[in-house]
Amino acid sequence: MELGLKNRVALVAAASQGIGYACALDLAREGARVFLCSRDAERASEAARRIHEETGATVAGIGADLTNDAAAEAFVALAKEQAGTIDVLVTNGGGPPAGVFDDVDVRTLREAFELTVVSAIRMAKLVLPTMKQQKYGRIINITSMAVKQPIDGLLLSNTMRAGLTGWSKTLSNEVAQDHITVNNVAPGYTLTEQQHEHAITRARKLGKSKEEMLDVWAAQAPINRLANPEEIAAAVTFLASDRASYITGITLQVDGGWSKGLL
């Protein structure tokens, strides 16, 4: 199926590993020109090199901390300078630390807000003028299944991702007339480096091994396994494509049936 992504210019945040990397790789496979970033410039460059070698696509890896105004501006400016435009933005701020209410202080709350919510809004602010001018754009935010059903022990993630979802839905209505779509992808438990770290943290509190914790999570989904990052990326790529031109303002769950809600 032709997705209409050939020669589109895509920015993917936090893409040196995990879901972000899988998104950058899948977009490159479809022929998009990809600019990816990571806080670690060396890891970003290495990720870009691997994707280019596998796909032959033009891929640039840039060191950028998107919680910093100047770094985010430089990332977007570089993409515009080299590619001339920006068609697709994938925000992927990463999850804030696990914890319950008693673990959270105001400083941690602010840091989580900056990481998960403000970084995505900042990037949208930077790319939207270009998208509006060309009357085309795709913004996809990586959130979490927690926006449908909050997860015990992830108070910060539950709170921040719900806020990001409200912003995204509102923005989708504001920019629809400019042929810009804004959607979210809400992954379930996914086999990433971060998920393994979370498994270790939860396992210690519950007196289990990491492997036992991963098995517990897998059993919570009717599909009875955890997702691979590539399965999340496939949903992102579809929403970034011309095939999804009439889809906006949604949160697409990719959770193996984990969420029990009807809507």
Located regions from the model:
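Short, small/polar-rich loop/turn modules that mediate ligand/substrate recognition or access, typified
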Residues: 90, 176, 181, 247-249
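Alpha-helical segment proximal to the catalytic Tyr-Lys
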Residues: 129, 173-174, 245
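Short C-terminal tail/terminal secondary-structure segment
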Residues: 149, 237, 248-263
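Residue(s) in the substrate-gating loop at a strand-loop-helix junction
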Residues: 144
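Substrate-binding pocket helix/loop in short-chain dehydrogenase/reductase
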Residues: 100-101, 105-113, 139, 217
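Conserved glycine-rich cofactor-binding loop
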Residues: 9, 14-18, 40
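Active-site helix of classical SDR
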Residues: 124, 160, 168
